[in-house]
Amino acid sequence: MAAPLIWINAFPGTGKLTIAKAIKSIGASVTIIDNHQLIDPVALRFSRDDPCYQIERKRERERAFKRHVQDPSTASETIVFTDFQTDNELGRSVAYEYQTAAIKAGRPFIPIYLECDLEVNIERATSQERVFGTTTKLTDPILLRDFRSKCRLFEFEGLSLGICIDTTNKDPSDIAKIILRYSQEVYKRE
């Protein structure tokens, strides 16, 4: 059986990429696809309100699935995607793309949901590293507060897989160990 696809879904600034990097530092063979690797090339060409934006985002995901998830030469690598999908029509549709890609490739699909205290989330999202970074990461505390008050994070319902982890007071390496342990348990059951 192929190695799992771990899909980390959380609000911006929760620690997705930091935790994915911690997973890679512990795991033997891990490939990380940060959502900004899929967002930023599209954002260079289209504004988020352009009708072509979501079409191009889907194409970027499909290319990533083909290259990293479905290519037989990557079957032994655990693939970790970071994402932010809310519980609306678009968010559900995008989330199911990840699950479908894993199924097509014969990989266990492991959704991970991260949460953290609002004030900690804002502190992380407005860190110097993010504010002066080279990606389109959200750094606006007002917008983040608005997202968190109006949006619900998408979670697969009825799926026996998946865990939710509060990252507020946990070290990223400890969270990575929880995720890897859980993914190994799922892998053994499959």
Residue positions per predicted region:
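Conserved substrate/cofactor phosphate-moiety recognition/catalytic segment
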Residues: 18-69
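Conserved phosphate-donor/acceptor-positioning beta-strand/loop module used by diverse small-molecule
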Residues: 103-125, 165
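Short, amphipathic alpha-helical "lid/cap" segments that border enzyme active or binding sites
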Residues: 61, 65, 172-183
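Small-molecule kinase domains that catalyze NTP-dependent phosphoryl transfer to phosphate-bearing small molecules
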Residues: 123, 127-178, 189-190
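Conserved glycine(s) of the Walker
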Residues: 15
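Hydrophobic anchor at the beta1->P-loop junction of P-loop NTPases
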Residues: 8
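Glycine-rich phosphate-binding loop used to anchor ATP phosphates in small-molecule kinases
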Residues: 56-113
